[in-house]
């Protein structure tokens, strides 16, 4: 089963993206470098629950 998780910018905190992840419990949260529209540059985005 899939669960929905959001990705938030580590600099400004805005939630820009959503992901469908497997429901298997993971120890670490997903970290991806994506473009932030608020900051106007590529920044690290971390999974929010």
Swiss-Prot record:
The lineage of its organism: Bacteria, Bacillati, Bacillota, Bacilli, Lactobacillales. GO terms for biological process: translation. InterPro entries: Ribosomal_bL33 (IPR001705), Ribosomal_bL33_sf (IPR038584), Ribosomal_zn-bd (IPR011332). Keywords: Ribonucleoprotein, Ribosomal protein. NCBIfam families: PRK00504.1, rpmG_bact. It comes from Lactococcus lactis subsp. lactis (strain IL1403) (Streptococcus lactis). The keyword Ribosomal protein applies. Belongs to the bacterial ribosomal protein bL33 family. It comes from the Bacteria. The gene is rpmG2. One of its GO terms (molecular function) is structural constituent of ribosome. This is Large ribosomal subunit protein bL33B. GO terms for cellular component: cytoplasm; ribonucleoprotein complex; ribosome. HAMAP family: Ribosomal_bL33 (MF_00294).
């Amino acid at each position: 089963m899939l669960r929905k998780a959001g990705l938030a910018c580590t600099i400004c905190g805005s939630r820009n993206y959503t992901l469908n992840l497997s429901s298997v419990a993971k120890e670490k949260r997903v970290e991806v470098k994506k473009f932030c529209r608020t900051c106007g540059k590529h920044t690290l985005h971390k999974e929010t629950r």
